[in-house]
Amino acid sequence: MHHVQEARHAPAVELGASIVDIEIGTTKLTPAMNLIKGRASCLVSHHDFQGTPPIEGLEEIVRREISAGADICKVVTTANSPDDNLTMLQLIARFPQVRLVSLAMGNLGLASRILCPMAGGDFTYASIERDKESAPGQITVSELVKIYQMVGAWGTET
């Protein structure tokens, strides 16, 4: 997946990206999406690096992403409380027909990262190796697989 902030970065599709992440606040969102649509899935994202707003505000963000034409919606906040995990998972439940990634960053957001796909979210994020994380609180793929295996959410053949 490639992250696009301006239409000039759309060549990610030429590099073989199957999903391109475009921030909802991108000034040239529509032209960027027009370059991508039909060639890759458009993931329209929102990141809040300060905290986790009330669920009503998060719902409005998802509605804006849907209106923008997102194939996949992504809402990522920063957990300042363990309760923020529940808020992010509740967001998934409120949009059952939408491909949605909803999780919280930071150490306090770990539960939402792990549970997002188990709660109906489209997928989650993990780093390939330690110290290569793309966001605070991200765990490695191998750690995530071990957790999923322990709770019976992943086959043991890995």
Task: Show which residues each predicted segment covers.
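Catalytic beta/alpha-barrel core
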Residues: H9-L29, L43-P54, D71-S81, V101-A104
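Generic hydrophobic/aromatic pocket-lining and core-packing "Φ" positions
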Residues: H9, A32-M33, V62, R113
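Glycine-enriched alpha-helix->loop->beta-strand junction motifs that scaffold or abut catalytic
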Residues: E14-I19, L35-V44, I66-I72, F95-V98, ...
